[in-house]
Design a protein with these regions (language model features):
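Conserved "landmark" site that anchors the functional core of diverse proteins
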Residues: 1-318
Length: 318
C-alpha cells in the first residue's frame, strides 16, 4: 500500500506466497549452512513463523506483526527453555505435522488440540520430548482458532528488521509455511527449567472486550457508539491476521466526506462503508482512510474467537 493513501481496499486478504514450485526451505541466519531443521510434512491452511514482532517501525509503515497471542507464544518458549522472544510457529485451525532432524523439546499452547509424538499422546501446555526423526502431530483446534508451537532452539529463519515474524499483509519476513519446507533450528538452549503455570484456554462463550472511544467517534451519529456498546456482534468467517470482521447492527456515520489517511494501531475498530466494525489485529496496515470509532485494549482473545462467537463491547471501568 502506497504511503499516504487511504486504506480502502479489502483489509482482509490472503497471505502472500512466492510464485513457483514448493521451496525446499527457509534461509538460516546470515545465509549460513543449516544442518538441524524442522521438516514440515503438513502445514495446514495458514501456519506462519512468529515471534514477538518488530516494534518501532510504524512511522515507516511497518506494523509490529508477531504472534496474535504473545503471552501464549511466550509461555510455549518458557516451557522448552527458550527466551520468550524466540520464534515459533503459529498454527491456524486444522493443525500440522512436523518432523525434527534432531532431538528437541516442544510445547504447544493456545487452543485445545490432540498432540502426539509418534503414537504417544501429549498435552497442550506441557513440554514434550521429540526424538530425532519422530513425527509430531498437532490436531485441529477444538476450541479457539490457533495454537503456538515452540521448539528448543527456536525457528532460526533470517530476521528482517530485527524480527523473524511473518507479516501477511506486507510480505515482510519469511513466507507462510508450506508442505515440504525445512525450517532451520537454533542451537539447543539447554534443559528446560521447571515452569509452574496455569494454561489458559481460549474463550468458548460470549466474548467481552473493553473499548476506548475515539479518535473519530464524532464522525458517527449520536447513537452509533451506544449501539456499539449496547448490542451484540458476531465474529464473521471472513477474517485473518490482518483483522477480525464483525457483523451486527450497522454503525451509521454523521460525516459522509472523505477522511484523510491517518495512523492505525493494534485493536483499532475501523468502520467501512457498510457500517460493520472491523477490529485490526497484528498484521494491520499502519494507515487507513475509514474512520476509527474506538480501540480495543486487548485483541488476544478476539484472535482466538471462532466464526459465530458473540462479541460485546463495554467502556473502560472507572
Amino acid at each position: 500500500m502506497a504511503a499516504g493513501r487511504a486504506h480502502r481496499a479489502d483489509p482482509v486478504r490472503r497471505a502472500r506466497r512466492p510464485a513457483g514450485p514448493a521451496h525446499p526451505g527457509h534461509p538460516g541466519p546470515a545465509g549460513g549452512r543449516v544442518t538441524d531443521v524442522l521438516e514440515v510434512r503438513r502445514a495446514g491452511p495458514l501456519t506462519t513463523v512468529q515471534d514477538l514482532g518488530r516494534p518501532g517501525y510504524a512511522h515507516l509503515g511497518v506494523p509490529r506483526s508477531g504472534a496474535l497471542d504473545p503471552a501464549a507464544l511466550a509461555l510455549a518458549n518458557r516451557l522448552v527453555g527458550n527466551p520468550v522472544s524466540a520464534a515459533g510457529l503459529e498454527i491456524t485451525l486444522t493443525g500440522c505435522e512436523l518432523r525434527p532432524t534432531r532431538a528437541v523439546t516442544v510445547a504447544v499452547t493456545g487452543a485445545d488440540a490432540d498432540v502426539r509424538v509418534g503414537p504417544r499422546p501429549g498435552d497442550v501446555g506441557r513440554p514434550l520430548a521429540v526424538p530425532a526423526g519422530a513425527v509430531l502431530r498437532i490436531g485441529p483446534a477444538r476450541d479457539g482458532l490457533r495454537n503456538w508451537l515452540a521448539v528448543s532452539g527456536g525457528i532460526a529463519v533470517e530476521p528482517v528488521l530485527g524480527s523473524r515474524a511473518t507479516d501477511t499483509l506486507s510480505g515482510l519476513g519469511p513466507p507462510p509455511v508450506r508442505d515440504g519446507d525445512r525450517l532451520p533450528l537454533g542451537p539447543w538452549p539447554g534443559p528446560p527449567p521447571p515452569v509452574d503455570v496455569t494454561v489458559g484456554r481460549p474463550p468458548t462463550g460470549e466474548l467481552r472486550l473493553t473499548l476506548r472511544p475515539g479518535p473519530r467517534a464524532d464522525w458517527f451519529t449520536p447513537d452509533a457508539l451506544d449501539r456499539l456498546l449496547g448490542t451484540p456482534y458476531t465474529v464473521s468467517p471472513v477474517g485473518d491476521r490482518v483483522g477480525a470482521r464483525l457483523t451486527g447492527a450497522p454503525l451509521p456515520r454523521a460525516v459522509a466526506g472523505e477522511l484523510p489517511s491517518e495512523g492505525i494501531v493494534l485493536g483499532a475498530v475501523q468502520v467501512p462503508a457498510d457500517g460493520q466494525p472491523l477490529v485490526f489485529l497484528a498484521d494491520h496496515p499502519t494507515t487507513g482512510g475509514y474512520p476509527v470509532i474506538g480501540v480495543v485494549d486487548d485483541v488476544s482473545a478476539l484472535a482466538q474467537a471462532r466464526p459465530g462467537t458473540t462479541v460485546r463491547f463495554h467502556g473502560p471501568q472507572r
